[in-house]
Amino acid sequence: MSLINRILSICKTYAYMQPILINNAIDLLKYGATGELLCQNIRNEWLYSNVTSRDENVFQFYNTGQKTCNNDILSLKESFTNAKQFCNNQLPFSFADSRSLCQQENLKCLDVEEKKLFSPRNYTRLKYIAFCIPEENQQYFYHWQRQRKIWWRKFSANPGRFSLTEICTDDNGLESTEIRAEFPWGQETIETIHNVNTKMFDNLDLVEQETFLARVGKRKVLPHLVVSETSLEKAFMVFLCDGYAELPYHNDIREVFRFHRKLAPYKIMFAAPLSNAKKADELKQLSVYLGQSLKKSGVSTLISPNLAKKSLESQFVDSDCLGVPYTAVLNETTLENGILGLRSIETTLEEKIHVANLTSHIELLIKNY
């Protein structure tokens, strides 16, 4: 079985996603419960990096009913006017879109099956548009390339797979570069970054161009644009394929998704060895109680119905395939002294902690990048 088919098999079993095919082309990725959580975390981290933590003001926008999602300038007219008011008409400021549902008009005929999964016909775009001071846009173009590459690498189990292409200049003098990820079947282009300058305004009449004038000090200028774009589907597939690993374990191989803890759909789940009905019920009640405390603290937690009803190893298989960074291992001794084992997906080793400290300890572990 090929690598991508092994990944897709786990995706189906553990409710990540299923590709929907129409006429031998992938129309969309249909997400399951686990996949929805992974998508949500990817989008949240993209927004944090591109909106929340930026030095300049970044405003979100959303194109309704515009399936092709090509030139956004006119659709940004109202948003741009509002942004100028918020910024006292002064550059720089930016826009970000993480919700527009787009459709590829001319779906490329891809020979490699794996590549089709990265480019479904319908996708949710993640687009960032920086409106720069004219004298600073070139420097910002270089800066933004580095920032976007750092973002991909930060959440990767294999940061070395990401690279920037050489900057290309087209016939109109527009510069562009791509971020690519290396996989066993070849390179995937996962994000494009363009130095658009003022080209987006060229097809507008003078009255419409007036709308997009902003100030640098006392000067009125047309902003120079730097644009980057990827999609939620690309990011989903990148981190899915990046995180998948087959690791040696007890003279065997274990399949695992090594997600960054910020992206992992579930941060923690519970496991317990096979026990008699009475002990199994007590362990289940304890896991529910501890799980409620974690959930109230905002920690995505999974309470498994198989706790103490299947072998411990089979429960670990589930947590590894779900990419859960930490598994709280309960046993009969836990009921007596409150000590549990906290298993790491990376090392499979267990750290002993008291149940009273579990929530605060997990909060600390997942807080940092």
Report residues per predicted region.
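Conserved acidic residues
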Residues: 325
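TRNA-recognition modules of translation machinery and tRNA-sensing kinases, especially anticodon-binding
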Residues: 2-309, 332-369
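Short beta-alpha junctions and helix-cap segments that line functional grooves
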Residues: 313-316
